Amino acid sequence: MNSETDLGTTIGYEYGPEAGEVSLGEQAVIRSGSVVYCDVSAGDGLVTGHNVVIREDTKLGDDVVVGTNTVIDGSVTIGSHVSIQTGVYIPPNTTIGDHVFLGPRAVLTNDPYPIRREDPLRGPTIEDHVSIGANATLLSGVTVGEQSFVGAGAVVTRDVPPRTLAVGSPAEHEPLPEHLDGNNLIK
């Protein structure tokens, strides 16, 4: 397997009697305090910071970096070449494409009416080559289109079209400036 786990990690936390296996690809690095539940699969090159939680039924592609104190709360699909910075929260039923950057303390949500109604939980969909700035919030069910850029502190309440800049609270859409146009360079 050619992987490295620090002391104080839990790989294969059994959340119930039906819990399956964990599958980590080559060259995984799981740092101390991190918990990876059963029924998680990751491609090659997964690297975590300290105190990361990756819950059950999560699938991660190749070369995913998960920053310290990040929670991936289960039933999440993450593509390849993704950089998730410190303190990010990713709720169940979220889909993240390839070559995506999530800035520090970004928060994704999946419940449009917390404890008020019993609506189905719908996490955001983040398409390929998207960058999400620090402290941005994405509300339940929104889609951020490919090659878009969400500014720091933005609150995204509605879908962001491809190649669009979303800034402010609530986020307004602007044409993507030329210097932000193109693919993310995450390898």
Regions from the PLM with identified roles:
Residues 155-157, 164:
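Leucine-rich solenoid repeat scaffolds
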Residues 1-2, 185-187:
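Haloarchaeal acidic low-complexity proteome signature biased toward cell-envelope/secretome components but also
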Residues 2-143, 169-170, 177-178:
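Flexible, glycine/small-residue-enriched loop-and-beta-strand segment within the central core
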Residues 162-185:
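Conserved beta-strand-loop-alpha-helix hinge in the C-terminal portion
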